[in-house]
């Protein structure tokens, strides 16, 4: 078994057994998920059939179904979705599935969306291909999550430490580490920006620190530049490279669509 397959199995086992990590997901309340839901709802036609990947505790799927859509929420962990049964209805169902091997037929959904999933998969290109496969022609793909390549994360950490706070676990635990992370992210993002092809960078998940949050368990060094280039290369049309709801988010997205803190790519299958 190669290293990436081993890491994939370790991640599955971790997500099936970690009570502490489940508590982090359960803290994702309506307020936390509202921006994601609003962005998906903005592009979904009335009564769309939606696939919500990596839905964790299932709440985001429930919120989308409340808007009149038919929603299937999925997660790799039965443990995470254990409480979702009480949310199910005629327009909402859940299933356990791996984003790298979705149990759905080609062109099944009007919308395929994910929030804070892509950085956790061990093969991001394959996950994106699976999303495109089950998406209908003309359908909407929305991929959201942290831009781990953003140089602005280190700025936030340096400000926090200057005020007496702590840095980010794994990524920027000291000022020196934060400065190095910011510089590396800037040079990496610039390299990606001017590269002809997507360059998906794998990283080894740090599961010992995953219970502290901060995407220590990420397996892909996520960047919107990779996703943009890959989707375009596979016939998708980018509608929004950095979609946002708030005024601050829209300004950030307009000024730094590929370098901001978050990924919020919206594309259409042509």
Predicted regions and their residues:
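Short glycine-centered segments of the SAM/dcSAM-binding site in methyltransferase folds
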Residues: 49, 139-140
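A generic structural signal for alpha->beta connector loops
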Residues: 68, 91, 138, 235-238
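Short conserved loop adjoining the S-adenosyl-L-methionine
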Residues: 101-106
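Short catalytic micro-motifs in class I SAM-dependent methyltransferases
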Residues: 116-120
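Helix-to-beta-strand junctions that scaffold the AdoMet/dcAdoMet cofactor pocket
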Residues: 121-122, 135-136
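S-adenosyl-L-methionine-dependent methyltransferase catalytic module, highlighting the catalytic core
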Residues: 125-130, 140-264
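Active-site beta-strand termini and strand-to-loop segments that position acidic
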Residues: 267-270
């Amino acid at each position: 078994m190669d290293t990436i397959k081993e890491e994939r199995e370790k991640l599955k086992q971790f997500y099936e057994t970690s009570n502490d990590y489940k508590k982090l997901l359960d803290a994702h309340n309506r307020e936390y998920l509202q921006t994601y839901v609003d962005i998906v709802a903005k592009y979904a036609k009335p009564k769309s059939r939606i696939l919500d990947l990596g839905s964790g505790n299932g709440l985001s799927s429930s919120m989308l179904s409340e808007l009149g859509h038919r929603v299937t929420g999925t997660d790799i962990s039965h443990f995470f979705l254990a409480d979702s049964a009480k949310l199910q209805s005629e327009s909402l169902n859940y299933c356990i599935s791996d984003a790298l091997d979705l149990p759905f037929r080609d062109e099944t959904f009007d919308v395929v969306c994910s929030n804070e999933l892509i950085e956790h998969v061990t093969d991001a290109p394959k996950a994106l291909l699976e999303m495109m496969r089950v998406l209908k022609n003309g359908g909407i793909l929305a991929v959201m999550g942290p831009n781990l390549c953003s140089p602005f994360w280190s700025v936030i950490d340096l400000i926090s430490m200057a005020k007496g706070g702590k840095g980010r676990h794994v990524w920027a635990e000291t000022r020196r580490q934060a400065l190095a992370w910011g510089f590396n992210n800037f040079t990496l993002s610039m390299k990606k920006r001017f590269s002809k092809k997507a360059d998906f960078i794998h990283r080894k998940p740090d599961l010992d620190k995953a219970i502290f949050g901060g995407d220590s368990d990420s397996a892909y060094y996520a960047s919107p530049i990779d996703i943009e280039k890959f989707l375009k290369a596979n016939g998708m049309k980018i509608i929004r490279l950095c979609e946002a709801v708030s005024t601050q988010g829209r300004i950030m997205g307009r000024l730094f669509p590929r370098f901001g803190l978050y990924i919020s790519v919206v594309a259409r299958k042509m």
